[in-house]
Amino acid sequence: MPILNSKNLKNILITGGAGFIGSNLIKELLMNHKFNKIISIDNYSTGRKSNHHKNKKVEYVKLDCRKIFENKKVLNFKPQYIFHFGEFSRVVPSFDLAHDCLDNNISGTYNVLKYALRNKSKLIYSTSSMSIGDKKNENLSLYAWTKAKNFELIRNFDRWYGLNYTSVCFFNVFGENQISTGPMASVIGIFERQYRNRKPLTIVRPGTQKRDFTHIEDAVNGAILSAKKGSKKMYFIGSGKSYSILNITKKFKTKIKYIPKRPGEKFTGKAKLYLSSKELGYKSRYNLESYIKNFIKNTKI
């Protein structure tokens, strides 16, 4: 389903366009949708040039969201849609890198909101299931707190200034181009790397933590549907099924190793898809179990 009317081609700005979700979004837009031009801005803290798509309709700009008004090319661009995926995005590192998390997420997003208002753009904000917290506790970590406060700020910008927005709440996205090394690595990315290297899969104690996992293609589809149909709400994008971390590791059929508890750990997580299904027509098409089976089948160790 094309996101845009082919008779009225639109400009699209994507923050974090060289990152995991952003690069897959650009891939999908290039393959199946009509638009005028995409500009990706990324500070490349986790984004990679290897994620770039060579296409004359896509331009990559190395730029931090906090400096979005300092680049003439971006300043003169008039996007109808802004997909804001360029934020500090992990729980545990937010404790040690508190300044980076706070400055990137609060100051960076504030500038993106001003830019969206200036251009009368529709903002598609990527929040996180971690910002909901256990029992709606957003204070588990600085990362979760900043994501929750940014969504609150976005809603207030609508009340105060008439910001056009929608939000997608992703649940543990996995798949092509996911980060597998370093402090920003995702859990499935880490398990895949450990499996390839014949290392035990590391489980943060106690291992009973439950997560909903979302395939990258479902995440991208949810973001596009939200851009097209979403209206000033938060839409959950997930599979609607939760797995314990221990249960996931068992599907790899290899050795496991427990590691100490970490701060900010969330123990429950399952996407409630009623609103996304009703208003966006979203439906999860991929599941984690099949993905892991295919990964093991196609991985030689």
Regions found by a protein language model. Give the residues of each.
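Short aromatic-enriched loop/helix-cap "lid" or pocket-rim segments at secondary-structure transitions
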Residues: K49-H53, K136-N137, Q178-P183, I216, ...
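C-terminal substrate-binding subdomain of Rossmann-fold SDR/epimerase-dehydratase oxidoreductases
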Residues: L4, D64, R196-I301
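Short, surface-exposed alpha-helical segments at coil->helix boundaries
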Residues: K49-S50, F151, G189, S242, ...
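Residue-level signature of the cytosolic catalytic core of signaling kinases
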Residues: K54, E138, S180-M184, G230, ...
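NAD(P)-dependent short-chain dehydrogenase/reductase
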Residues: L142-A144, E152-R211, I216-N221, L225-A227, ...
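N-terminal Rossmann-like NAD(P)+-binding domain of SDR-like oxidoreductases, especially those catalyzing
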Residues: M1-V173, K293-T299
